[in-house]
């Protein structure tokens, strides 16, 4: 049974342009059934928090253009918990916004913040880890981030270095953060793997509402003032008008730079539950089931011949035949077709520019 003070914040404002043609500005990947399982990524995100947060304590921060889509795909959450950014200002301002909104309703709230477009293969382990972290933040003034145990020298993720010499007396699986590191070179990523104290930064945060609000007061007073000054109108009909007016005043900055790298009581819980940020087609190939020839096929009517190490993605009943390819992306969505070498996928944004 979920704790009534547990709140879930889903960040759902991104575009996911590297996942073209499936993901577009009109319908980003978080609103698409990427895995071909009958559930979109944002629906799968909510599913994995079952038993942790009640539907009435779910919040989504998104773009105005996606508000109706969120309401359609997550019908059990309160419509007034869909918070709309008038413009993109990275993650710190929107986390400050939703934190003050939650505080206005539940001063004892314990919050977990999650991206909307990641995948987790082991939901049971995920829930176990999140529950123990929420217990920890409910008893302390700590900020906890989840660190994924790396299984390859990945250069596309930021890393977190943990001080593994001593765990928290309250929880033997939680350690102090030593440092945050930018996306590394291949050589540096290999060094991180050998060191074993470095973990992928998954962008999943856990804190009490009082802890995160106080952190914004101390480390980002300008951003904090924008939303603290709006406290009397949060949850009223005037909220969106005032947000539209004052949200653009906020500095565009990530919560990692704004809070995580400045605050003192920062902890990490190393975890391994089959996580991926699904940032690229290649990451989808890594995470999905493959045939004997290394192909990942998501689609109901796909035939392949002499084809190896490809990802083929087409939803619906369209027939797709692929012959003689090795290491390619073949993806079709709503009349748009991509055939691209996996080794060149970093250029998809360039290819898809209109």
Please describe what each predicted stretch is.
Residues 11-12, 61, 112-115, 145-149, ...:
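Short beta-strand segments
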Residues 42, 98, 117, 160, ...:
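Residue-level signal for inorganic ion chemistry
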Residues 2-5, 209-354:
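Left-handed beta-helix
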Residues 1-10, 18-25, 36-115, 121-131:
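Conserved N-terminal catalytic core of the sugar/cofactor nucleotidyltransferase
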Residues 60, 83-84, 113, 144-148, ...:
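General beta-strand structural signal in soluble alpha/beta enzymes
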Residues 123-243, 267, 317, 341-342:
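Conserved core of the sugar-phosphate nucleotidyltransferase
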